[in-house]
Amino acid sequence: MEPGLDAAIVALGGNDMLRGIAPEVVRTNMIGILEVIKEANIPLMIVGSYAPNNYGSDYKEDFDRIFPELAQDYDALYLSSLFDPFIINGGLNRNMSQFFQADGLHPNAEWVTKIIDSIGPVFLELIEATSQK
């Protein structure tokens, strides 16, 4: 990690989930990253990810709890998902296609705007934490 950083945001795990990588492997990899950040003694924000139901309830349960647990373990600010603005009644809005780039995976400008609105309050907390350091 570069010296002199004021804070870190870790937003990983989505591609691991899409590849069906075991939650315990994802957790171990995240811990490796978080330990490096912990050694730097800088404020941390973790952005989580959710597994879909089609991986089975055990996988979903194990995967979904990785990020909130690690945020607690590492005293990090936490945002449950970049998808939060699109979750309705516990599931993703069925009209999501309008928010994706042509690849069907990555957000377009409209979605990025919604992400910024969602992440903004937690990000401001991170900025405040850096000024208190």
Describe the function of each predicted region:
Residues 1-133:
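Alpha-helical cap/lid subdomain in secreted, periplasmic
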